[in-house]
C-alpha cells in the first residue's frame, strides 16, 4: 500500500504540468491488467489496461472527476484522493512522488 509523501506546499499547477499528469495517469492505467487486479472480464476492451471507470471505482472517486484529472483539466485533488489514485494504479513510491509533484502537492 502506498503512503503519502510529506506535503511541502500547494501551488497553482501550470498547464504543461497538468498535461504531464494526465499522460502519466493514462500510461499507468493502460499498463495494468484488469484480471490481475481481480476485475471481471466483461466483453471486448477498446483500450488496453483499465477503464477510467475501473480506476475511479478502485480509487473511490467519481468517474467524471477522475476523467477530468486524466484530461489535465484544472482540478485540485486532495492528498487523500491522490493516494487513492496511486493505490488504484499500483504506483511505486517513486511514481507516487511524481504524481504528487505533477499535481502540485509536493
What feature does the model see in each segment?
Residues 38, 42, 72, 83, ...:
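Flexible domain-boundary/linker segments
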Residues 3-27, 77-83, 87-106:
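Short amphipathic recognition helices of helix-turn-helix/homeodomain-type DNA-binding modules
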Residues 14, 19-58:
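Short basic helix-loop element that most often maps to the first helix and adjoining turn
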Residues 36, 61-69, 77-80, 94-98:
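Short N-terminal amphipathic alpha-helices
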Residues 1-4, 57:
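Detector for methionine-enriched segments
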Residues 42-46, 52-53, 59-76, 86:
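Recognition helix of helix-turn-helix/homeodomain-like DNA-binding domains
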Amino acid at each position: 500500500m502506498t503512503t503519502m509523501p510529506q506535503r511541502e506546499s500547494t501551488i497553482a499547477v501550470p498547464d504543461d504540468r497538468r498535461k504531464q499528469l494526465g499522460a502519466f495517469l493514462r500510461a499507468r492505467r493502460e499498463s495494468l491488467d484488469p484480471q490481475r487486479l481481480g476485475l471481471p472480464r466483461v466483453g471486448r476492451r477498446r483500450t488496453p489496461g483499465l477503464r477510467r471507470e475501473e480506476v475511479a471505482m478502485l480509487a473511490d472517486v467519481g468517474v467524471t472527476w477522475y476523467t477530468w484529472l486524466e484530461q489535465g483539466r484544472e482540478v485540485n485533488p486532495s492528498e487523500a484522493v491522490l493516494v487513492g489514485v496511486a493505490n488504484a494504479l499500483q504506483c511505486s513510491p517513486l511514481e507516487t512522488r511524481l504524481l504528487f509533484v505533477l499535481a502540485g502537492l509536493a
